[in-house]
Amino acid sequence: MTNSLYKKHIISIPELSRAELELIVKTAGQLKAEPNPELIKNKVVASCFFEPSTRTRLSFETAIQRIGGDVIGFDDGGNTSLAKKGETLSDSVQVISNYVDAFVMRHPQEGAARLASEFSNGVPVINAGDGANQHPTQTLLDLFTISETQGRLDNLNVAFVGDLKYGRTVHSLTQALAKFNNIRFFFVAPDALAMPDYILEDLDEAGISYSLHTDMETVIPELDILYMTRVQKERFDESEYAHIKSAYILTAALLEGARENLKVLHPLPRVDEITTDVDKTPHAYYFQQAGNGVYAREALLALVLNESL
């Protein structure tokens, strides 16, 4: 039977069904347990990074090679003919589509991945981040990590802390988890960085439980997942930033009343919102989370490039 992800463009999380998310998570677990170095043998993937990336690019390129594919591309869009000779993105994509079996693309412009998918001649485009819009593969590795640590994706209490207004990772992960049953969200942020209304309205419409908080200490004892984010200094004046930052720093002491199964996640890089003493607790899982990016991306590539996997 053909899997529904075969040759599918992966542009945003809302376009993926619960069944597709579960298939990716299941496949990631299988590949972590039993590597398969020939899954995409003789397939060529274009790694097109029009803005700098470390974790995402290296994770994708590692994933491609570990399951037998070849990778071509660039990690500095400023040195491409698109930038230097004025070639349009649509023209570049149409040309490159003749050489490859899939695209992995990061671009600073919102909507760039969707535009690329319209000119790729049926070659699947995987969005590795388009501006502040979507970063779906981060969400896939987050789901895999949650499933790995909790043994389920239903019946979870999940808190997001910090910059919930501008953080594309928390928007996408909220949209993904909302597809599962009995999820309770805790949104912890200063008023200036609160979760956008459109996310809350979608949760209201779906009848999904959530609560808004400005303090994380009171919610920690109820949580299965604590997802930390960085409060971005550039969005505040010095005095306001110092006040807000100090209210959203996770320490080991704050975790003393946490459930045994609680895991702390973070999309990285962290600055000082998680103190290093948290690293030594059994709750810290953000470095393993980053490592899971390879397996989630292996799974996605394998499913997009194999008709009957």
UniProtKB/Swiss-Prot annotation:
InterPro entries: Asp/Orn_carbamoyltranf_P-bd (IPR006132), Asp/Orn_carbamoylTrfase (IPR006130), Asp/Orn_carbamoylTrfase_sf (IPR036901), Asp_carbamoyltransf (IPR002082), Asp_carbamoyltransf_Asp/Orn-bd (IPR006131). Gene3D superfamilies: Aspartate/ornithine carbamoyltransferase. Pfam families: OTCace, OTCace_N. The keyword Transferase applies. Carbamoyl phosphate binds at R55, T56, R106, H135, Q138, L268, P269. The keyword Cell membrane does not apply. Pathway: Pyrimidine metabolism; UMP biosynthesis via de novo pathway; (S)-dihydroorotate from bicarbonate: step 2/3. GO terms for cellular component: cytosol. L-aspartate binds at K85, R168, R230. Heterododecamer (2C3:3R2) of six catalytic PyrB chains organized as two trimers (C3), and six regulatory PyrI chains organized as three dimers (R2). Catalyzes the condensation of carbamoyl phosphate and aspartate to form carbamoyl aspartate and inorganic phosphate, the committed step in the de novo pyrimidine nucleotide biosynthesis pathway. NCBIfam families: asp_carb_tr, PRK00856.1. This is Aspartate carbamoyltransferase catalytic subunit.
